[in-house]
Structure formats: C-alpha cells, structure tokens
Amino acid sequence: MGAEKITSKIVEDANKNAEKILAEALNEKEAILTEAKEEASKKEQAIAKKGEKDAEMTKNRILAEARLSAKKKLLEEREKTIQLTLEKLEEDLVKLPQKDEYKDTLLKLIISGVYSVGGGELELLLNKKDFEVIDDSTLWALEKEMEDRLKKVTVLKKGEAKSIIGGCIIKTADHTKVSDNSLEATFERNLDSVRAKIAEMLF
C-alpha cells in the first residue's frame, strides 16, 4: 500500500472523529457568541444613560472579542484534529511491515533508492526482519531489473541491519551517495504534504 493510500485510509477513519470534534467546537463557538451578545446587551443597557454611541461601541467591542475567541477555538480544534490524525498515521506506519502488501512496498522503496543514487555497486541496509523478506533470489531479480532499466551493471550487497521501522537505506560503495527510504525518513520528508492533505480531506 503506497503512502498516499495509507494516508487516505487513516484520514477517512479520522474524519469521523473530526466531525465530532468540529461539531463540539461549533457548539462552543455559538455558546461564546450567545454569551457575548447577552453580556453586550446588559452592558449596553447599563450605560444607556451615558449615550447611545457609547453603548453601541461597547456592544461592538464585546462581540468582536467573542468572534475572535470563537475563531481561535476553532483553529485550536482543527490543529488538534490534524495532530491526532498524524499520530494515528505514525501508529499505522509502525504496523505496516506486518501487512501482506508490505513486501511490495519495500521493493518499490528499494527500486526508488537505486534510481536515486544511479545504480552501480550499492549497499542495501534493512532492518533484521526485512533481510529475511529480501532473500538472495529476490535480490538477484532486483539487480537484473535495475540493470535493464538503468542500462548499467547494478549490484546490491547486503549491509548491516539497521534499527529502522522498515523500508531501506541505499548507499553507493564509496558512501558518497545515500538514499534514505526508511519508513520513518519517508514519513518525515512528506510531513508537510501529508498535513496539507489531511487538512484538505477533513476540512
């Protein structure tokens, strides 16, 4: 499952919670404005003797402050919803290697990494469990596929096991080029676009 599909699924789940949170925020907004109108009305009456202009100014000031407070509350709830969705996305990211489709995702990340550094003699770094997923026959097939695509001899040598959730890190033999396609690095690189997508889908 690609990052976009994963994000879409999590956002879909989060949308239910978002609707509830936003409904509560809107109710609170209405309560703030209602209370402000009542307060403004009372103060307007209290200072009516001082003149209609002063009363109107006081009323407008109170209502403006209430609108600002309500808007701030909505923005806070919106940010909270986005943050909760991101946290859920990170939780699902940790679970991704347990899913049936993970091997396909891992292969795509490896291919992307090989493209990024330009092929040649490369070092493949995975976590311990993923080295079991990518056996020698799979590695050989990857090398052949990349040679055909890049028109360049490509050798993938297994390096040391890394403490990563999943995904891969590809290095050239001289370590001058590195492509970090670990799941966590990929998530961090796409964090801004993921936030924007969540906001677009939820709001």
Curated annotation (Swiss-Prot):
Keyword Nucleotide-binding: no
UniProt cross-references to InterPro entries, sorted A to Z: ATPase_E_C, ATPase_V1_Esu
Protein's membrane topology: Peripheral membrane protein
Gene Ontology cellular-component terms listed: plasma membrane; proton-transporting two-sector ATPase complex, catalytic domain
One Pfam family this sequence matches: vATP-synt_E
A GO MF label: proton-transporting ATP synthase activity, rotational mechanism
Keyword Membrane found: yes
Record key words, sorted: ATP synthesis, Cell membrane, Hydrogen ion transport, Ion transport, Membrane, Transport
Family: Belongs to the V-ATPase E subunit family.
UniProt function note: Component of the A-type ATP synthase that produces ATP from ADP in the presence of a proton gradient across the membrane.
The name this protein goes by in its record: A-type ATP synthase subunit E
Species lineage: Archaea, Methanobacteriati, Methanobacteriota, Methanomada group, Methanococci
Gene: atpE
